[in-house]
Amino acid sequence: MDSKDFTQLNLEEHSYKVNREKLPIDSYIQYGGFTYANFTPYIIHGDDGFGEHKQLNWTNKLLWNKLGKLNIKDTQILMQNNISEEQHNELISLEAQKIARENLADRINYLQNINTSIDFKLWKMNKENLERQELLLRQINELKEEIKSLKNIPSTVAIIPTNTYTINMIRTETEDWKYFKYIEKELVQNKTEAIAKILDNSYIINDNLGLLYERYEEINPTPKPYKRPETIFDTPQYAKYIRNQKRQEEYEKQQELKKENENKEYQEFLEWKEKQQKDKGKGIQTVYPTLIIPDIKPEKQKKEDMMLEMIKNLQNELEQLKIQRHKEHEKQAELTKIQMLEEELEEELDPDNLEKEVLNNIQNIQISSDISESSEINEISDNETEQISGSDSDYNNEQINVKIEGEEYEYKDNYRYYKPQPPYYKKDIRRERQYKGQSSQRADYIKNRREQFESTYQANMNTTINDSGEILNLDCTTPEEAEDRIQKWTQSMSIALVKQQLSNEQAKQFIRRTFIGNVKEWYKNLTNEAKQKLEGNAPLLSLTHMELGLRAEFGKLGIESDVEKHEKKTSIARHKILQLQICSMDHQNLNAYLCEFQEYYYSANYTEAESENILNMFYSKLPEPWGQQVLNGYLSEIKGKNLLDSIGARMTYLQEFISDKCKENWTQKQARKIQLSKNLDCSYYEVGKYGCKQIRPHKRKRYYKKYIPIKRKYFNKKRYKKYYRPKKFLKRKNPHKACKCYNCGEEGHISPNCKKPKKKTRINNLEALEFKNTEMENLEFETNKNDIIWVEEIEVIQPLHYEEEEKYKGNYSDRILQNPYYINSISIEELDNLDWEFEYQEDIEDDLEYQNFVYQESNDNWYSDQENWYSDEQYLGIYMFIGETSGENNQDNMEGIIKEYNKTEPEKINKIIFTSEKFKQIMENDLNMTKDKIFHNNKLKKLFGKKEIEYYIVTDIEHPIDVKYVQNQDKIINLPLYNQEIFENEIQKIPDKDQNKIRNIHLAAVEIVVKAYFREGIDTPFEIILCDDRITYPQEGSLVEVLIGNLIYQKVKFTKIINYSISIEDKNLDKSLVMYWNLEGIKMIKDSKIFSIRLRNLYVLSNKHIVKNKKQYNGNIIIEPIFQDVIQNNNRNYIEYGKPGKFDRTKLKSYSRRFNEPLRLDDRTNIQREKDQIEKADHNLELQKELNNLNYYSQQGQSSNVLDIPKILKIENTKNNYKQFHIIGKITEGRLNKFYPILIDTGAADSYISSKILEDEKLVSNKLSKVVTSYNADNEKHIYDRNTEVIIELIDKNNEKYKINFIGLVDQLRLLEGGKAEILLGMNILQNLKPYCITDDYLEINLGFRCIKINRIKKDIFEIREDLQQMNVLNE
């Protein structure tokens, strides 16, 4: 934008108070700290990249303020230490008033930044002018150097006259000095004449060079270097060639060092600035001297010297700009009174809109008299006329003009209708359809049918507001319409009062004269006290009181407040946006959908977290397959590149997407047959082809005529039948159609003719619908007095006790039927040898069912109605015991874990080691609950199945838990596992015909995975309690499940069978199943995430209440064998588990202590019983090995329910163990030029560099008061500064290199693995790279506004080290 256009820009609409430290990185156009670019009033975005940050570019703000916003008087006031109120009022510029309240240091810094930009521009131009002048002088200096070279010759040989551009001819040595002739000085007009003169004399010099050469040989007979024989010096042509080469080399060097010299250039500018300030303080004025070449007559104005003219033009232009800005400041001083009125209107009106009206429409206002002369509208009493006549002298013969606009405010006494109109008199399509009936004619019928599917939304586009006042008529209006009219009347009157500059008394009369009809009668009937309350001390205050009185009388102010009105509007908008649907992609329907969605979105007032889900819903509501395609395309193509995710961007992408699809289909030959365009209105986006497309009229479909008419006859006594046209007979191979009976499944008859007993319908809808809704939600909830759960110390779980051996004599099936727990003590092969029979007995009186096991050969799975269900990958039977333990190290041996305790402190753990296979199984295990897994056997189908409507829903959701909800809790926090909002969303997805029929929700099962946000191997016992908080008495009835466990694996998983129903109208639905927890053994810093809870809920939406066999399935829980070592359910009965009267947070016992207890007598009996069973199968070698293991553990005194492993001596031999996230970085600072592995940890770990890197390379760091202590492998202590700077070079997927300066990587941390050359980046570094994203394949970080993806190294840490050693060797 040119400088002349500054007057047309309203800076107040764009400028905001900007903190310079919070500006984004690329706010400066070219240089960091200064710029001389052109003015570009564009809005830029903030540092996060999301959300609209209305910050004016700092560069533009500096240029604007320098060129016109601050004058000399304002600058002098701002430079004072203390600014008084009088001086503050004298400030003319609004920008000066904003910064007048700041500190002196901030004001001076602000003024310096303003002067820096324009001064740098002048300095830059002066510097370029000097450079060009130097280029002109450089050629002359080269000529001088040639002349000086001749001066070095002895005087006896050659004589060179001084101060001349011509050279004498060299004479012989015998000639006297007095006979030498000197060429007279010639005045050279310009540079070209001087060069031509020298070239002419060069030939004379070359003729005498021979003499010089001979003389040189006589004086100096020593051998000389190789030179051309005819001359000592080069010819002028050769000298010119050398000069050109030097210039070319200098130009290339300047281009190469241009980028490196940008910061140097800024330093030169600062030095020049300081020098200018010093000279200015001493009273010295810098004068640029004119350029005078010796023996050359300078001209007054040269065409070649463009830089001098440019400087003069710029100086003149700046002077004109300053004069122009000074005039604008004088005009702005005249508008200070109007700005005072703006401050009064801040609470009543929108300041931005009012500013436009005031600044653009202030003119010499002459008030005409239209209302005062109309006696029909203004019927004023005698007292009022006297007051008005008395105040007419103050008006200076000016009159008030009230403008009446719009038919809705038109008032006529002769045509007043008090009878309300029917509700469908307005032209609204949604209301109008209810009164449309089908026409008898087919054309009208088709037209009406088409209108039913047209757009049903019309936006209110009438947004005009009068600036001259309006008549207020509230006759025959509803409270809603009265609110709208009063609001519009208030806005129009406020602008009119400010524009006409009326006094308080004149404003009161002006307001009263706008009342007509019922409003006028209401105001007349008011008492004097009531009228005084409606009046104020200022015109706008009186208008505000009058607005409140009108709203209380005619509107809804007495019924609901503004806050309640806003909340109601928000809730209605949120409810409507969920019900919004679009079924046809016609352009009219699409435009209506966009308009209505936009209105509800802005009225609902969503937060930033909710906004993204709602914006995704904008695409998901489109008909399939367009909704998912558009959403995926937007997320992949636009969202990563666009700086602002808004409705406008999504609307634009949707229109472009439809346009592109229609263009693709148009190029194909059979566009109408393609499935991709069947629901799109491509004619709206196509290029017009008028008259080319044939419009076919509607035709009925022709059907096959079965009968033909007979011939006409004049007279026929008998009425014969019509002629019959038989169809062709097709002979079939099997004339009888094969039918199959639904009851018995046999062919040959149908179910009504079946003779077998009728089959009862158990489940109406076996094909259940699954909706997966994966969302990330932050845990934000509060509790009240009722949301309390008591936790008491729970005894350590002991192995199952079995009855004596005599009770189980007989075959295995009898034993299992008598004791279901006996199945855990036999092997799998013995289970295969059993003769299983399906037995089902039902006692009608007791309503009990015996427990039976069913074996299905087709799927090879075991199922039990009350016990756990496992897939074929899981196993039942005896645990395999391997390895050996060492009592000297005092180790606890768990399944896959070895703990090494300290010798001096037995409770302190020194090292914890895992097996890679065990940990790999844990990490790969995830949520896998499905409806088929829960509702697999017939008994469960009978339990949960219903004849009526049933929809089986599976939802998936994850909650990250903050550390403040675990450590130092003032309140007991719970997590609702079910949410009413989730239920409502799933009900919206089922067919419309069944949505209104859903009345109950049957909670079938919930699968829970708890994942830690810290590394594995930390002994962290925890307790989980599932409760139904709706039950207050009895207390034990609220307990659903109690579990104790340990997060030593980083993950635990279990499934709970809930099996009870709730009503969809229950207001306490969120309390139907909640989770409480207690975790110990670890402490983390504030604002850290300690673990996450992922839920997969299975529930049934039904129209009836499901209550069958509830007692049989109460308390069922599924814990897979891989997690049975780290989590167990409490063996207490729920009736015996009582809550104490007062909540006491007791310390949970460490889960590892149960492994230290000695073997009890019951456990030894169980081992002996298992030995007897294994001895019966001598032919099985594997069982014999298990027998040996049992003998070994019986001697050691260990429990048979504990799985031990041998001690792992070398964990480094473990392969394919890349569970951690590693990338490769190269440290390039100083002597550090090596590749190192970088571990990414998003948990609570701090960032650090291993002591090996710091010790070997000795990084240079800043000295601070706080230091950091680190230990290496030899337990040597090293101290480093806390703010050590390290430059790490990262390589993205496209092999582009990025150098990042990381500060503060070294933290106080004892490196247990000592000496390992590794770098760890924790949350304190990753938070500075927001937004960042970690996937299985790459790490995505944000540098400025650029997204960088870095590949993950999917190798073991030991393999990575070997590869890096080779890379470092090649690098060296």
Swiss-Prot record:
Identify the keywords attached in UniProt to this record, alphabetized: Capsid protein, Coiled coil, Metal-binding, Virion, Zinc, Zinc-finger
> Domain of life of the organism in this record?
Viruses
Pfam families reported in the protein's UniProt record: MP, zf-CCHC
Offer a single GO CC term for the protein: viral capsid
**Which stretches are annotated as coiled coil?**
126-153, 299-350, 1162-1189
Region: Disordered, residue numbers: 372-398
- State the InterPro entries in the record: Caulimoviridae_Movement, Peptidase_aspartic_dom_sf, Viral_movement, Znf_CCHC, Znf_CCHC_sf
Q: Where are the zinc fingers (CCHC-type)?
A: 739-756
An example of a GO molecular function for this protein is: nucleic acid binding
Q: Which SMART domains match?
A: ZnF_C2HC
- List the CDD domains: retropepsin_like
Compositionally biased spans, kind Polar residues: 386-398
Q: Which PANTHER family match?
A: CELL-TO-CELL MOVEMENT PROTEIN
Q: What is this protein called?
A: Putative Polyprotein CP
Organism whose genome encodes this protein: Cassava vein mosaic virus (CsVMV)
